[in-house]
Amino acid sequence: MRINSLDALLHTVKDRPRKRLVVAWANDAHTLEAVSAAVEAGVVEAIVVGDEAVMTQVCQEHGLPKERFRMVHVATDAEAATRAVAMVRAGEADLLMKGLLSTDKYMRAILNKEQGLLDPGAILSHVTVMEHPGHPKLLIAGDVAVIPEPEFKEKAAILGYLVKVAKALGVETPKVAVLAASEQVLPKLSSSADAALLSKMADRGQIKGALVDGPMALDGALDPESARI
């Protein structure tokens, strides 16, 4: 079944066993409110790692039932990241979430060669799933958070992650637009040349399971009228 909205995604997840979510440094209202809503929706069981006194106070001030969370006390945000990652490694949690700590501390724990989460040689990237009222389907994009200037090998990995997520959402043959500043293939513009190469690799079966085209501009990828013009 293809999932075309975030509501449909939520309903699908509700029908499955709850995942165990661990949050690194859950010391703020926004984080605890979001996690509380996920617990209430029946999506996750929550472990929140942070300053227990602060988290308890936030729950009291914002009317959040403390019993929805398993609280793990640590003194610092860096320690929270390390502890949360360790819980995933040990099989005590299934999902990792960033709370109110800096991205560099969060990533440092994930990428730690001895105690992190990545296999040797693996590429860490980012995939986001979005809903737009003017578009009938979910939009899946990457990488917009982790790798600011990906090299070709990283772009190929990102494309693979996008396809994997799309298929998990029920898209049998995902259509992937590789974006660039120019829709012409310009050797001096690496983004356009890389996009063309990824497209050709898909044509030749080196990238499987998706229709890939590029280089493309964002408007042409999303709007049929723009593409026609």
Segments predicted by a language model, with ranges:
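Anion-binding alpha/beta catalytic cores of soluble intermediary-metabolism enzymes, centered on
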Residues: M1-I47, D51-I229
